[in-house]
Each structure stands twice: as structure tokens, then as C-alpha cells.
Regions:
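Short glycine-/small-residue-rich flexible loop motifs, especially phosphate/cofactor-binding loops
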Residues: 19, 181-182
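Long, charge-rich low-complexity segments
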Residues: 191-219
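Amphipathic C-terminal alpha-helical segment
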Residues: 104-110, 158-167, 190
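C-terminal active-site-capping segments
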Residues: 187
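Charged, glycine-enriched surface loops/patches
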Residues: 179-180, 219
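GST-like domain detector, emphasizing the conserved glutathione-binding G-site
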Residues: 1-141, 209-213, 217-218
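GST superfamily/GST-like fold recognition
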Residues: 141-178, 184
């Protein structure tokens, strides 16, 4: 079997989820970067939704980061999922919640007007408070052991931290979420999952847009 090929966009958080998993599993892989604003035909031919990540394993194409990560986990032991089926399903459910949080956060920093910005900010606060209630003593979602659900949240926390350092939103008091975020950002696979100039690329991506959200972070 040849090295798996991960088809990527440089600042995509869903790609980053899979890169973190590949690094945690110590799987050798290759990366092919595309421009999602002008995707090549060969990519559209293999990606049903026209989205990244896509993982090519020999002649088989996988898409959707959660599916890719579960495949990688199954074929590269030891597992990064709980043994108990109910706990494993619980992790999957909160991975989906993390996806919605990413979309909420994206909607915040791309908001066209102040009202939308404030609505997204309120949604983000409420959802972080909800997430707080799911966390135990840490340092990770399942306690001492890093899991796929942690890989799913790390890209969100990295982006939130970058923007909080640039201009704080005054997020709600969520000490467990904060501690979890700090533990994930300190894990070697997380900074290694993006380029050295990721912060600049991410901020350039935001501030190149028009609207209240980009203006907030240009200030």
C-alpha cells in the first residue's frame, strides 16, 4: 500500500483535524494543496461535495474528516476512541457539536453587520457554556487519554485563541473549556498540523473579507 494522500486547503479546520490524527498515529502521508476558490477538475471529479479533506488510499477516495479519522483510527492501532460503545457514540455526538461550533465561529468573524456579529457571539457563548457541562477533570475530553474528539476541537480552539489574542471578545467563564483548549494547543501534533505562518495566513484570510466581522479584527 502506498502512502495515503491528503488533499488539503491550507487553513481548513477540517483538514487540520485529519492531519492531527495522522500525526498522532505516526502515519506517513503526502499532502496535495488546492485552491478551493478555483478547484481543479480532477478534485471535483473525486470529491462529491467539492470539499476538503479528501484522503486517497490507493484507488479508494474517502471524504468527510470524521469518516477519514475513524478509518485512520481503525487501521492504525492503538485506538483513539473509547472502548465502551456508548461512550464512543457520545464522543461522536460531541464531535458533531464541535463541527457546529466551528460554523458558528466562522459566522462570527465573517459577519456582514453588527447585529449578525452579536447574534453569533451570543451563540458561541451559549454553546461554549453547554460544552463546559460535558467536561470532567481533563486534561482531555475523556480524561487522561487523547481521543479523536480532541482532534476535532483543536482547530477551533487554535482559531479562537488567535482571534482572542488579537481582539478579546470577553467570552463567558468556562474554565474547563479553557483548560482543555490549553492542553490541546500544547500537544505537539496541534502546532505541527499547520504551517509555521498559519496565524498570518488565517488573519489575512479574515481581513481580506468585507463586513463587520472582518472590520472588527482589522481594528
Amino acid at each position: 500500500m502506498s502512502k495515503p494522500e491528503l488533499i488539503s486547503f491550507a487553513i481548513c479546520p477540517f483538514v487540520q483535524r485529519s492531519v492531527i490524527t495522522l500525526l498522532e498515529k505516526d502515519v506517513a502521508f503526502t499532502s496535495t494543496y488546492i485552491d478551493l476558490a478555483d478547484p481543479p477538475k480532477w478534485f471535483l471529479d473525486i470529491s462529491p461535495f467539492g470539499k476538503v479533506p479528501v484522503l486517497k488510499v490507493d484507488d479508494t477516495v474517502l471524504f468527510e474528516s470524521a469518516v477519514i479519522n475513524e478509518y485512520l483510527d481503525e487501521v492504525n492501532p492503538p485506538s483513539l476512541q473509547p472502548v465502551d460503545p456508548l461512550r464512543r457514540a457520545h464522543n461522536r455526538a460531541w464531535t458533531v457539536f464541535g463541527q457546529e461550533l466551528l460554523f458558528t465561529h466562522y459566522g462570527l468573524y465573517t459577519a456582514a453587520d453588527e447585529a449578525t456579529f452579536e447574534d453569533r457571539q451570543a451563540d458561541l457563548h451559549a454553546n461554549l457554556a453547554r460544552l463546559e457541562g460535558q467536561l470532567g477533570q481533563g486534561p482531555y475530553f475523556n480524561g487522561e487519554h487523547f481521543s479523536l474528539v480532541d482532534a476535532a476541537y483543536a482547530p477551533l480552539f487554535q482559531r479562537m485563541t488567535i482571534l482572542e489574542q488579537r481582539r478579546p471578545l470577553g467570552l463567558v467563564d468556562t474554565p474547563k473549556v479553557t483548560a482543555w483548549s490549553e492542553a490541546l494547543l500544547a500537544r505537539p501534533s496541534v502546532p505541527a498540523s499547520v504551517s509555521e505562518d498559519f496565524t498570518e495566513q488565517f488573519l489575512d484570510y479574515i481581513t481580506a473579507k468585507e463586513g463587520y466581522g472582518p472590520d472588527w479584527y482589522r481594528a
